[in-house]
Amino acid sequence: MKALKKLFTLALAALIAAGTTLCVSAADIGPYSENGKIISVSHGGNWGEYPIYSKAAVESAFELGADCVSVSVKRTADGQFVLCKDNDLGKLYAPYKGQLISALSLEQVSQIRITDSFGALSDNRLCDLADAVDAAKRFDRTLIIDDGWEYRKELYSYIVDKDAVSNTVIRTDASKGDIKEFLALTGGALRIVGSYYGNIIFNARSYVTSLSKAGCAIVELGTKNPFGVIFNKSMLSAFGKNNYLTRAMISTYDPDLCGQRTDTESTWNDLIDRGYSVIETNDIKGLVNYIGRISSLRTELMTLTASAEKLDKNNCSAKSLQEISDAKAVAAQALTTLSSHEALAEAKHNITLALNDLSVSNENHVRKGVLKISAGKIIAVILVTAAIVAGQVYTYKMQRKKKAAKSPS
C-alpha cells in the first residue's frame, strides 16, 4: 500500500508540474523529427467552414492550431499574388468560368465573391498573398506556398521585403538540381519543401539524400501505390543519413498521394510510426487534437517512468523487476523517437500494468533476513494452535472412552 501511495503522490506532483515537454536532440532520433514533434499542415486552410483560399479559411486554420497552412498562388495582370489553385477561376468557382486571374488586376480579383463548399456565393473574397503572410506572422506559424516555383525569384524578393522568411516555405516538385541551385542562390535563407512522387526506390533515395545535403528543410514523398517504397522504413532511413535534419512529409488529404489511405487517425498512426513527421490534412481539427493527445500521453508516460525509477527495488520479486524493466525499455523507446498515439498508448498500458502488479506484490514479499510480524499473523497462529490443541484433547478423550468400554466389569 505504501508503494501505491508513493506512486500516486509522484504522479500527482508530475501532473501539476507538467508544463514542460520532452526535449530530445535530433541526433538521438536518427531519421525522425526533432523532439518527436509532429508538424500539422492544413491543406488550403479551414475550408470545411470557410471558402477555400479565403482569408477567413487561412486565419481559422491557424486559430485551430495548425503549424502550417498550404496555399497555391497565381499572379495577377499587375504582378500581384493571390491564393488560388488554377488560373481559370471557373475551375474552382463555377460562376466565373473563363475568367483568368492573369488577365485581371488585383483590385478586380479582390471584388470577386467566392463560393462556399456548397457552391453558394459567400461574402468572402480570394485572399491575396500579403494577407496570408501577415496571418502567418501574426500567429507565428508557417505558410507553405504551392505552384509558385515559376515565380520563385519574385516570391523570394517579396518574402524578404515582407520580413517573412522565417514564416514562409516554398513547395515544389522541381528537379533536385533546380532546387539545389535556388538554395545556393538564396544562401539557404528560404526554406524549401521538395516533393517526390513515384515508386522507384533509387530515385526516391537519391532525391532525399541530395536535397538533405543541400539543406532542404522538408522532403515530401507521395505515391498511389498502397505498398509503395515510400512506406518502407529502409527508404525513410535516408532522412537520417549524416545527421541531416530534413523532415519527411506526406499528404493524407488525397488518397493518390498516400497509397490510397484515408485522412484519419489510423492512417496517421501508421505513417508516423514509419517515420513521417509532417502531415498535410483536410481535417485540421482532427489532426491538431490528435497531436495534442500525443503530447499529453508523452507527459503521462514520463511521469510513470519516473515513478518506476524511484520504487524501492528491495521489496520487489525478480519477476516483478523484469516486468518493470521491460516496460521501461518500451517507454524509453517511445519517448526518444517519433511515436504515434497508438505506440505511446501501448507503452503507457505496459508500464501501468507493471506498476499495478508491482504495488500488489509488494504486500506479499518480505526482504531476505527480515521477519515481518503483524497482529493478524499473531491471531492466526493462536487460532491454529488452539485448533491443534483442541484436536489432540478430543482424540485423547475418545481413546479413553474406547478403553473403558473394552475393560471387563
Where are these predicted regions, by residue range?
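Gram-positive cell-envelope targeting signals
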Residues: 1-28, 364-409
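Phosphate-group recognition and catalysis centered on beta-loop-alpha active-site segments
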Residues: 9, 17-296
